[in-house]
Amino acid sequence: TLEEEYPVSGFGRGLKLKAKRVKGDGTVSRVTRSPGEVLLEYNSIAGAARGIGAALAKIECKESTPFKTLGIMLDVSRNMVMTVDHLKMWFRRLALSGYNMIMLYTEDTYELPDEPFFGHLRGAYTLEEIRELDEYAKCLGIELVGCIQTLGHLEQIIKWGGAYDKVRDTASVLLVDEPKTYALIEKMIAFWSEALGSRRIHIGMDETHDLGRGRFLDKFGYESGFELFNRHLGKVNELCKKAGLAPMIWSDMYFRLSNADQNYYDL
């Protein structure tokens, strides 16, 4: 996999790379150079990849981390998406830096069955493309995790009028308690459950400042954003459990909604 871009080969005539697996918590990577040879000691694929990065840079290192996960979120929701090949390039370089987890932030940039306007004109990834990326990431010791939106930041689909009017609260927020909302979210979750081997998923839900202030207010009257948020999260959590996934969310709205001025801090 690294051979696609870097001078690493099982049949090369350069320095001999000897690899030795060792025990250790977190990620362990040690590189020692001697004439004609590089010794790489590692405890995981991520540690080995970081060691190869050090070897390619012609440096020695002795490193370990106090944590098990070193991750990054790649935003593929701005304009058109990165191509699969370009993402693979990112994966290779992140592997050489010791990363073992990548989140793909996709608001609407993936295809859903019977949802032609979801990802329309945005270069949405197919199920097969995400599976291909997942297999590639595994070869590099990287866990690929879906990072989606299940409440706010969905203006790119809500803008398609008639297609998503029934699930619209505001211009970017989905309508809580609407059955069609949860039917759509279930499709989102099913896509990532089927596409990736990881049993983790990030379900977003950040920056929903106008939650309950649009069509929800017109239909049902005022209800506190905190109550709406909690109720919606509970329903989405059940959908994740049904798909065998462990969800995580951004934390900002719990700070904001529990503050009288919707700020992060009381000053």
Which residues does each PLM region occupy?
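Acidic, contiguous N-terminal accessory segments
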Residues: T1-E63, I249-L267
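Feature activates predominantly on carbohydrate-active enzymes
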Residues: S34-M248
